[in-house]
């Protein structure tokens, strides 16, 4: 039996210190939005008024290289239960990144106004907010560390292992261009890295289907 929106929110760090009564009100204020692949939820620079929780599918959080070109760097991949778009609630700033569906997806759109109303009457909610922000900082620290200490081949190995979700055989859930954005390199350099894994016998590839043959060696290359 699928979880209710209220139950889904309760499992998220942001709402870890939120009372059941407040969760019920926040969930009731949410609106379900259905998205097709490529649909943009919001763009970088827009004025925000809501946060989102992924109900199904995958959402990419990315920053662009405009006006120089159309390349993007994917900062995060949001999946079922993940919350994003909360920063504007805390600092009233514009969106710092864009959010786009990578496949047919649905999200729960939660107005900031509903969350702010509960924060005023239940300030202990801030403990959950702090917990989520701390986890965000840890992720950004890891991304920064990867960019400094791992080359493109190492970052490609790491992203493939993450996208495999622990399975040796998997279908890549993103395009080659999107994978390049996650790695922070050109598509050509990422393809060369993948080709090197295949040549070494660590990986097999058929279109978007992959089979990891030497997970330990891939893991060592990504650390």
Q: Model regions: which residues?
A:
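Short phosphate-coordinating micro-motif centered on Lys-Gly-acidic
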Residues: 41-46
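Glycine- and acidic-residue-biased ligand/ion/polar-headgroup-sensing regions
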Residues: 38, 49-64, 80-81
